[in-house]
Amino acid sequence: MHIKKGDNVIVISGKDKGKTGVVQSTEPKKDRVVVEGVNIIKKHQKPTQFNPEGGILETEAPIHVSNVQLLDPKTNEPTRVGYKFVDGKKIRIAKKSGEEIKSNN
């Protein structure tokens, strides 16, 4: 998966198109990512011993990785991800600017 935890991404399709956020978690087996402030759902919570009031909680739901695109660290525009070997290590680069992509995690 070309998106990692801590990356800045923009949503390119769906109900939250155009929103940007930081990737909070990834689910590689399902090809899904959870982005901060994107795809907010309301979850109805029954009262429990720990939360006696229950109620409606708002939380982020995972979205498919094909619906998000990485933001170029140099130009802050959507870009594709490329890979390059430097000193025997594989690093991610932004296709638009050639800048190295570093995660914020």
UniProtKB/Swiss-Prot annotation:
Put simply, this protein is called: Large ribosomal subunit protein uL24
Q: Which PANTHER family match?
A: MITOCHONDRIAL RIBOSOMAL PROTEIN L24
* Annotated function: One of two assembly initiator proteins, it binds directly to the 5'-end of the 23S rRNA, where it nucleates assembly of the 50S subunit.
Note the InterPro entries from the entry.
KOW, Rib_uL2_dom2, Ribosomal_uL24, Ribosomal_uL24_CS, Ribosomal_uL24_KOW, Translation_prot_SH3-like_sf
Biological process terms from the Gene Ontology for this record are: translation
Family note: Belongs to the universal ribosomal protein uL24 family.
Instruction: State if Ribonucleoprotein is listed as a keyword.
Output: yes
The protein's assembly and partners:
Part of the 50S ribosomal subunit.
Query: By which gene is this protein encoded?
Result: rplX
- CDD domains attached here? KOW_RPL26
Q: Name one GO cellular component term.
A: ribonucleoprotein complex
Asked if the keyword RNA-binding belongs to this entry, the reply reads yes
One MF term in the entry's GO annotations:
structural constituent of ribosome
Q: Which organism is it from?
A: Staphylococcus carnosus (strain TM300)
Q: Which UniProt keywords apply?
A: Ribonucleoprotein, Ribosomal protein, RNA-binding, rRNA-binding
